[in-house]
Amino acid sequence: MSDGNMDVDESPVSWKVKSLEKLIDGSSFSSTLSRLSSSSRLIPTSRDFHFYYNFDEFKRPIDEITGTSQSTLATIGDSEQVWGKSMKFPGDVDDVYAEDWLCNVNDELIERFDVSVDEFQRIRKKEKEIGRSVVADDGDDGFQMVYGKKKKPVGNVVTGSAAVNGGGSVIDVKMAERDKNSSGKAKVPFHVPTIKKPQEEYNILVNNANLPFEHVWLERSEDDLRAMHPLEKFSVLDFVDKDVNEMEPVKPLPLEQTPFKFVQEVKDLKELVAKLRSVEEFAVDLEHNQYRSFQGLTCLMQISTRTEDYIVDTFKLRIHIGPYLREIFKDPKKKKVMHGADRDIIWLQRDFGIYVCNLFDTGQASRVLNLERNSLEFLLQHFCGVTANKEYQNADWRIRPLPEEMTRYAREDTHYLLYIYDLIKLELQRMAKDDAHTDSPLLEVYKRSYDVCTQLYEKELLTENSYLHVYGLQAAGFNAAQLAIVAGLCEWRDFIARAEDESTGYVLPNKVLLEIAKEMPDSVGKLRRMLKSKHPYIERNVDSVVSVIRQSMQHYAAFESAALSLKDVSPGNVMDKNIEPISEKKDLHTGDVASPSLKENSSQLESTRDLIMGAANTNEGRGLGSGLFGSAKVSAAVRISKKPSSGLGALLGNAASKKKSRTDEKVKEDVKLEQIRSSVNLSFHSFTEKVPDSKSTSETSPKVYGKPEEMSSTMPASVSKEDGVKELKDDSEEASEIVGTSGRVSESKVSSSEMGDIILLENGDEKKVDAEDEPMSLSELSTNFQKCFKSMNKSKKAQKQTEFLNIEPFDYEAARKEVKFGEGHKGRQGKREAAAGQKKGSTQEQSEFGQGKRRQAFPASGNRSMSFKN
């Protein structure tokens, strides 16, 4: 009776608490997990499972377990009140999507548990600080997402600091507590996902078609080929300020004392237009969001006059801003002061059809003044002594209504800008007097501002090569199949982004895109498992993404050439390419020596090539042509490779590199031979009796050069030390002989280790070789060849005699007489010790002084060291 009353009186919450305590009890919980783990090992897997499944004794319990599990999972999936969304179970545990569904459910549960634990710890910490129980946390400054919670409105008041949008719905955002470890700065979110998209909230229509943007508010040129900006009717001189020295800077009122109005209605916009018509200058700035829109979305427009500040809600008044403000911004008599207006100008054109005339860009002015920094934050501190809070610069400006901190930040962007404009003009005027510039610095600022205004907005278009511009692709080193996946996913995300009016970075970030292409997941399960974070559009279209991957992999052949091109221009391969030691158009008497591979490089490699060429084109490199070929008519058309080759260095006879390690050890031998064979073409102009170039025939062809005056360090030679070089003088009778250890030159190949001997001619011989005054007859030519062959035969015979001069058969009889049998260990050991040069005596001496120490092969531990002595 009492137990029953206790059960009845016990609340559901307390019962759940007791159940959880019982579950996580140390002994029972761990033992349950242990038994479960042990029993799972008994279940057969893979082939064994299918074998046992043929027997009813195994099949029946398995079917029961399957049915129970499937029913339980279906119940979990149908609980929309728990998940807040539909998570229906696929219907069959054997379905390929069942595993993915289970992974998603587990991820959702774990995430909710983590959020709940963090919230619980935060509340407990606050309770300890204040000493009393806390039900919910009041809002502080900043913003923070709170999982699954919304502030409930009480009447027309929103509790805490949650925001109510124009439609009366509560935005799921609350002010976050300040971070004590970051000097009290609030945590400002870059993206608040719970904000309803302004495109849907305010019915903003955008044209994301893959077509060029049309500037419908501009006049066309006479040939109708381009749009004409209103500024083209004016000159820069029309906007330059006159009598700057007589101007007195107007200091602004404090921010708190300046009248301020948040413009959200058309009547307020009309009042703003009337105010702007009565002033000569005003400051403008825009706040923008690029993350949740394909082309971008202007969120706010800040305008300040000398006496008032305005913030225009560009969401609610989007269709009215252009008609009311277009003529004001176009008026050349009204000065518009902006800071860093490069992007603001095109945003005004895109969203409102507004084209600015008569602009003064303080960002360009700071560059002309050569200030320490060019940011607005620096200008505020430098000219006004105001420390701007720039942490809201990248905040999510779609939030409505604006919190007080963000409103203040938006006002500061334009409130002080006209005063900065006054001070900068004076600085520019002083700069002109001090430096005596040919062009006025003030005029230079207006020229730059003029150029900023005349740029026109262009929509991002998808082309067949758009995927090549993905950040990080060139360094990824993808093959053709991976590159095909990149192209397919780029096209898919572009289509989704245009249709949903989302940025491509939100639909599929570049980093995730490259990771998918690298892994090439061909199933839904593989794709889900590799994603480290949630991406809404991938989860909604996971089947489409996998289909794109599969289809792209089937058409990889079309991307072979693109993959090779990307590998050629990758940073690693660029530095591995051969270095051109001579400038591209270096005349070596035989024509220009230019590397075709350099001319074929794309524009993306220009800076890298210039860096390499700058390091290679030294004075020594330039002297190479003049030193070797400057005074000789015997010319060689050599295409110098960009990276020095040892074979080519040996060909040029640079003996300095004999002391250096070979630079081409990593290059295959056949590649080196092919490079030398294709790049060297020697032409001999004449043959003389005193210099019979006998080996210039088809069998042997030694290379003839003038004696080098300067040897370039950029052309390393790798001639073997055994190769001989013989200088031929004027009266030498042995001019036809070529001395070398090898005695011959390879008939078809020239390499670093098998180079023929190089004949170095002195200056007198060069003149004889170069003399071509008298033509040579065929008989003389035949005589020269015969003499060459005779000298070659003499050389070969002499070499053969020297090679086999001392060869005699081994005398075994004499060897037997030298052998004395019966001498034991002492004699042999003494001979070995004497031959080795060891300072050891006989066995008696060794026993007297003890055994010498030996280097141990193992650490001295235990009996390991003793084994060396025994």
UniProtKB/Swiss-Prot annotation:
Keywords, ordered alphabetically: Cytoplasm, Exonuclease, Hydrolase, Nuclease, Nucleus, RNA-mediated gene silencing
Comp. bias (Polar residues): 840-849
Major localization listed first in the record, in broad terms: nucleus
Annotated Gene Ontology cellular component terms: cytoplasm; nucleolus; nucleus
InterPro entries with a match to the protein in the record: 3'-5'_exonuclease_dom, HRDC-like_sf, HRDC_dom, HRDC_dom_sf, RNaseH-like_sf, RNaseH_sf, Rrp6-like, Rrp6p-like_exo
GO molecular function, one term: nucleotide binding
Biased composition (Basic and acidic residues): 720-729, 821-834
Domain named HRDC: residues: 479-559
Top-level lineage group: Eukaryota
Gene null: resulting phenotype: No visible phenotype under normal growth conditions. The double mutants rrp6l1 and rrp6l2 have a late flowering phenotype.
Cellular location(s): Nucleus; Nucleus, Nucleolus; Cytoplasm
Region annotation (Disordered) ranges: 583-605, 649-668, 688-775, 821-870
Pfam families cross-referenced by the UniProt entry: DNA_pol_A_exo1, HRDC
GO biological-process terms attached to the record: exonucleolytic trimming to generate mature 3'-end of 5.8S rRNA from tricistronic rRNA transcript (SSU-rRNA, 5.8S rRNA, LSU-rRNA); gene silencing by siRNA-directed DNA methylation; polyadenylation-dependent RNA catabolic process; rRNA processing
Domain 3'-5' exonuclease: 263-428
Annotated PROSITE patterns: HRDC
Function recorded in the entry: Acts as an important epigenetic regulator through multiple silencing mechanisms. Involved in association with RRP6L1 in the silencing of the solo LTR locus. Controls levels of non-coding RNAs (ncRNAs) from the solo LTR locus. Seems to function independently of the RNA-mediated gene silencing (RdDM) pathway. Functions redundantly with RRP6L1 in the regulation of FLC locus. Participates in the maintenance of trimethylated 'Lys-27' (H3K27me3) at FLC locus via the regulation of antisense long non-coding RNAs (lncRNAs) and the regulation of diverse antisense RNAs derived from the FLC locus.
Name listed for the protein in its UniProt record: Protein RRP6-like 2
Species this chain originates from: Arabidopsis thaliana (Mouse-ear cress)
Lineage of the species this protein comes from: Eukaryota, Viridiplantae, Streptophyta, Embryophyta, Tracheophyta
